[in-house]
Swiss-Prot record:
Keyword annotations of the record: Acyltransferase, Lipid biosynthesis, Lipid metabolism, Membrane, Transferase, Transmembrane, Transmembrane helix
Transmembrane segments: 7-27, 36-56, 58-78, 117-137, 148-168, 235-255, 260-280, 292-312
Any one Gene Ontology cellular component term annotated for this protein: membrane
Name under which the protein is recorded: Probable long-chain-alcohol O-fatty-acyltransferase 2
Amino acid sequence: MEEELRNLIKVWISALISISYCYYISSKISKGVLRLLSLLPIFIIFLLLPLFFSSVHFCVISGFFFTWLANFKLFLFAFDQEPLSPLPSNLTRFFCFACFPIKINKNPSSNRIHNKPMSKWVLAFKLLIFSFLLHVYRNNYDSGLSRFAFLALFTIHVYLEAELILVFVGALMSMLLGCEMEPVFNDPYLATSLQEFWSRRWNLMVPAVLRPAVHIPVQRFCAPLLGLHRAFYAGMLATFIVSGLMHELIYFYVIRKSPTWEVTCFFLLHGVVTCLEIAMKRMRWLPTPRRAVSGLAITVFLLVTAGWLFYPQMLRNDVHKRVISECLLVIDVVKRHVVCILM
């Protein structure tokens, strides 16, 4: 644990130095290929940073923050595109917007006082559910639950933990920068289509960077060859494939074994089905299913395909057990410190 914390400090210092180089040197180079070439060493550094960790949580978080989001944001920065262009007013803001999954809310709620209490109640309820899951884990979950029941609970765990971590990061950045941030999740369990789930409800920072970095360029490139209609689907498929490859890379950071490409196939499948779904929506003569029916269908599809392609590599390498043990370890450490303070 102490070694991991030392590595954590080293990684964040390395990230700060790297981003300082981008802010003070790369930003002075004219946009385009030359600035992109100046950023190549940073891309490589951010690609290697997660390898300093052995903890699943640190590997995943550093892989998501640096290797995925920061590298894609810097790629866009090379061509003077948002979110790092126009250049923020100081290094602190540039560092935060580059390395954290945050985006300024340009249309803040007109009635924040009314909405805030409800959000706190929802957050408290989610914390309660997450605590219940940890209690289930502590009481020999693996001996009393079927595989399907465990995967369903673990899916809820993944969602809740991801949202709670990113909400905490967003709140911290909001206080530091003095501006309201857009929510990272938008009640994904209410999605009634795959398109809605992936683009408007689940981890919204990912489509925020993949759309300008992958979807739009591929669509523009393919438009003269395929036409605008088909180019849109090509851009969408490319986006899902890139997302799958990035997930595959994060799996490698955690497992340190050659990829099996199951996770990439998961996202490729979802990309194909999402394209079919959009094509069917454009056929006006097809009946629109009820929200309850389509919502249930999407939930079942997500669980079945996740159990088939997303989780097997994780389960074979006992990643789920490492995740659970790390969560329980953190809870025990917090309890000990609270007891020491009270005594």
